[in-house]
Structures are given as C-alpha cells and as structure tokens.
C-alpha cells in the first residue's frame, strides 16, 4: 500500500469516527426535537462523499457510473443516466 492509500484509509477511519461522534442515539419524547425535514445519511454516504472529494470528482464520477449501471440492471433498462433535475432530463 502506498502513502496516498494509507492516508486515504486513515481519512476514512477519521470520517467514520467523526460521524459516530455526531450521531444522536437517545430520544426523549417531549424533549428531543423531531425535524420535519432534513438530511438523512449514514457513515457510508459520508465516507463516499469524502472519497469522491479526494479524487476531486465534484460531479458525476465512479459512484455515479456504478449507480447508473445498477439502476439499469434493476429496472431492466439497457442504460440509465443521472441528471440533476427532471428539467435537465427533458
């Protein structure tokens, strides 16, 4: 494993630790706020985000390609492509 891979692995571990330190697990009815909307993600999504950023893929990259391939397979379509909105897909 080269130096860059070692650093990347360390960053992934740190991101997981960061996520774990921010997670709220206790809920007290009447005291704990329940947001009506908001971001919902786990440590896997957070590490994927950081991993993409380390490759400087700020738009569609290898994760998008993998998702497109799996979506096409799941739906039985020959191809699939991600867009940023329904308007862009027109």
Positions of predicted regions on the chain:
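Conserved PLP-binding active-site segment in aminotransferase class I/II-type PLP enzymes
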Residues: 1-88
């Amino acid at each position: 494993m080269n130096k860059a891979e070692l650093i990347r692995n360390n960053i992934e571990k740190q991101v997981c630790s960061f996520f774990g330190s921010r997670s709220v697990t206790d809920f007290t009815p009447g005291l704990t706020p329940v947001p009506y909307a908001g971001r919902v993600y786990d440590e896997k999504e957070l590490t994927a985000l950081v991993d993409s950023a380390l490759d400087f893929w700020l738009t569609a990259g290898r994760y998008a390609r993998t998702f497109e391939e799996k979506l096409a397979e799941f739906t039985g379509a020959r191809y699939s492509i991600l867009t940023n909105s329904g308007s862009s897909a027109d």
